[in-house]
């Protein structure tokens, strides 16, 4: 089980890694939990010769294709997406361009730029309410609704690249798929109701801050629409 990493999501990854490690051991498998902080820890895998690397890493290095590429180089099978897919999807802007090309519904967006004006962005994105998030980060770190020009100006002083989108209001639904014996199977549909203004870092990782409803209540027609 590979966890930790070098990103701002390191703490979350370590907690998730510990939980996965304990679950895998309960299932009767022999497992090792490795805190990834660089290539030296990855080299340990040549000694362990694992049947599988279970990835619980987040953010830079862990989800951006670099770790996946190193595991490919070491011929170590791993969970999750390929190095190429990980690299693409870590960049929200590039991922959205691919989604649009493939005909998948996704909101319009703008990259934050020096001197950006909130009212101009509202006109460009045809929305009175805008939301900003990091271009490459995760766990909703730094994400917020842009209510004033000061909110936007604050982001100009940070080193991150930012993505600005219309604020989408609706139910928070998660639907996962798993491939078993060559066939894709959908997992139960989950609905999340955060106590905060949106499903932010605190709501995601603080016990009691989010209500999880499984399965999510919905019509069969809606369920089939989501699955398809």
Question: Can you describe what each PLM-predicted range is?
Answer:
Residues 1-3, 45, 88-171:
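Active-site nucleotide/adenylate-binding loops and adjacent lid/helix of ATP-dependent enzymes
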Residues 1-84, 88-90, 94, 113-120:
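ATP-binding N-terminal substructure of ATP-dependent carboxylate-amine bond-forming enzymes
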Residues 13, 225-226:
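Conserved anionic group-binding/transfer micro-motifs
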Residues 75-77, 126, 182-183:
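Glycine-enriched alpha-helix->loop->beta-strand junction motifs that scaffold or abut catalytic
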